[in-house]
């Protein structure tokens, strides 16, 4: 019997560079380590941000078959300070990023690919309450200025979060965020009476193929939806040179699909966006290859997190570890 279950695919890229401007000059000085470029912003833009906006799909003898704006097909966030720099120093790439979000809205039932980001990339659990709200509000305002819409999701620096951070996101109108699987503590089925038993997932074994709902501990009327990315596949993209071969990349994504799941599953990964071209040369081309040439043929439905939530909803509740991030074994 044919399996009619859907398999969604979301690839998220977190694109960020720290502010490098000399505060006295309000410009970036020459950075010798970025040679042959003027500075590291310029170098990473040339190696990653621009190529992903005009990424090539080629034959084995390097004949160009298509040119793809990868941002039209992936979930992404850009640091506000990075976009501020790009607006002035890489305007054409900047415009293609904004255009990609507009194009994605029509493909995803009114939901754009772009997510907002806390403004200064600070570790939110270490911030006081006022600074938490400031970072979120500034991030939202910057997003609205650039993308001309309200953000539905927000990326947390290093995915660092705690209960107070998630409550602040909720209070500011954010609907979802993305975390590491190792940040989840326990899950249970959502029921009206809340009597389902909790299952321990604290060692990173949460099922990443669905969304989860988190309720604020001090006020159960407040909730936010959380996605926990596929850890092993994300790690391979970031550290195992998976992006040197588009065929290996799509095979790894297919390995994230399980026939044992009796629901419409979401295969999704999240890494630093710089993986696609800066960390791995021509990684943008492996990405465009699987997005435009392979994903649909392999049974994937390309989507973003907001559209997935509208289509599939949330059936499970999650509790998270008290203070955690994707990059620190002892929390933050």
Region annotations inferred by a language model:
Residues 2-59, 69, 80-81, 195-234, ...:
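Active-site and substrate-binding clefts of carbohydrate-active enzymes
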Residues 8-13, 18-129, 134-135, 152-156, ...:
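Short, well-structured secondary-structure segments
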Residues 20-24, 86-89, 126-128, 157-170, ...:
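A short acidic (Asp/Glu
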Residues 60-63, 135, 139-143, 161, ...:
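Alpha-helical packing segments of well-folded alpha/beta enzyme cores
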Residues 95-113, 137, 149, 170-218, ...:
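Acidic, His- and aromatic-enriched active-site or binding-groove loops in soluble protein domains
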Residues 108-123, 146-157, 178-186, 224-233, ...:
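Core alpha/beta catalytic barrel or barrel-like domain that forms the active/cofactor pocket
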Residues 132-156, 217-219, 254-270:
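CE4/NodB-like, metal-dependent polysaccharide N-deacetylase domain
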Residues 134, 138-145, 164-171, 285-289, ...:
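Alpha-helical scaffolding segments of alpha/beta enzyme cores, especially the outer helices
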């Amino acid at each position: 019997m044919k399996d009619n279950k859907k398999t969604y695919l979301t690839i998220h890229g977190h694109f960020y560079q720290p502010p490098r401007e000399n505060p006295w000059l309000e410009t970036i000085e020459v950075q010798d380590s970025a040679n042959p470029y003027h500075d590291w912003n310029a170098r990473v833009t040339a190696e990653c941000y621009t190529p992903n906006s005009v990424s090539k799909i080629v034959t084995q003898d390097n004949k160009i078959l298509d040119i793809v704006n990868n941002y039209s097909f992936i979930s992404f966030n850009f640091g506000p300070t990075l976009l501020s720099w790009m607006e002035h120093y890489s305007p054409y790439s900047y415009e293609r990023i904004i255009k990609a979000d507009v194009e994605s809205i029509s493909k995803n039932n009114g939901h754009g690919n772009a997510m907002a980001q806390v403004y200064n990339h600070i570790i939110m659990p270490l911030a006081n309450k006022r600074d938490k709200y400031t970072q979120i509000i500034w991030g939202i305002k910057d997003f609205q200025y650039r993308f001309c819409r309200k953000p539905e999701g927000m990326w947390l620096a290093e995915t660092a979060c705690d209960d107070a951070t998630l409550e602040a996101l909720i209070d500011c109108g954010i609907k979802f965020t993305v975390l590491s699987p190792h940040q989840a503590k326990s899950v249970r089925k959502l029921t009206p009476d809340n009597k389902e038993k909790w299952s321990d997932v604290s060692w990173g074994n949460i099922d990443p193929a669905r969304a989860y709902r988190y309720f604020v501990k001090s006020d159960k009327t407040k909730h936010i939806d959380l996605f926990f990315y596929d850890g092993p596949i994300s790690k391979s993209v970031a550290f195992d040179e998976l992006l040197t071969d588009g065929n290996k990349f799509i095979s790894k994504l297919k390995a994230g699909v399980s026939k044992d799941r009796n629901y419409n599953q979401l295969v999704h990964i999240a890494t630093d966006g710089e993986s696609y071209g800066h960390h791995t040369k021509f990684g943008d081309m492996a990405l465009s290859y699987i997005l435009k040439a392979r994903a649909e043929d392999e049974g994937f439905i390309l989507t973003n997190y907001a559209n997935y939530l509208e289509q599939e909803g949330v059936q499970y509740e999650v509790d998270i570890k008290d203070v955690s991030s994707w990059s620190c074994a002892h929390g933050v």
